[in-house]
A protein has these predicted regions:
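Short, Lys/Arg-rich flexible segments
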Residues: 1-157
Length: 157
């Protein structure tokens, strides 16, 4: 599985790198000195709560839903376009963290839509786990335990 890399260089700009092999999404803010990498498991734990990451002593709210390797593979072009569009906002003097929030919200909406419409491939084994674990939660809210099994499955391929 090839990795997707989208890097934007320059000071005070958003940089984002999506790596399908390791299952890690790495986010870079500002000049790239302060960065934080999130695994799919960590993204899943954010669920609907949003996520605050301390970067350079400041908290940025990162609203994100779990993004799986299968999702990034299926919607690669859409994701890259969303990131490019959000990056263009710098010309309108939108701050880097706001650029990311806009991109994250669009990617989250795309992910939820993909999960709800069944466009993200899930193996029969994982589908059984998914049905058993979700309980009364909305279908796109996944537990950390389930995400571990999905992550292991997709990273193995």
């Amino acid at each position: 599985m090839a990795s997707i890399s989208v890097n934007f260089k320059g000071s005070n700009t958003l940089q984002q790198k999506i790596n399908l092999v390791s299952g890690t999404i790495r986010l870079h803010f500002g000049n790239g000195v302060h960065n934080s990498g999130y695994t799919y498991k960590q993204l899943a734990m954010m669920l609907s709560h949003g996520f605050s990451s301390e970067l350079n002593g400041r908290d940025y709210e990162i609203p994100a839903r779990p993004i799986f390797a299968a999702f990034t593979k299926e919607y690669k072009e859409d994701i890259i376009q969303i990131i490019k569009d959000s990056y263009k906002l710098r010309f309108k003097r939108v701050k880097a963290n706001e650029q990311f929030t806009i991109a994250a919200n669009k990617i989250r909406t795309l992910a939820v839509t993909a999960l709800l419409t069944g466009n993200v491939p899930i193996t029969p084994d994982n589908a059984k786990v998914y049905k058993a674990k979700k309980g009364n939660l909305p279908p796109w809210v996944l537990t950390g335990e389930l995400v571990e099994s999905l992550e292991a499955e997709y990273v193995r391929k």
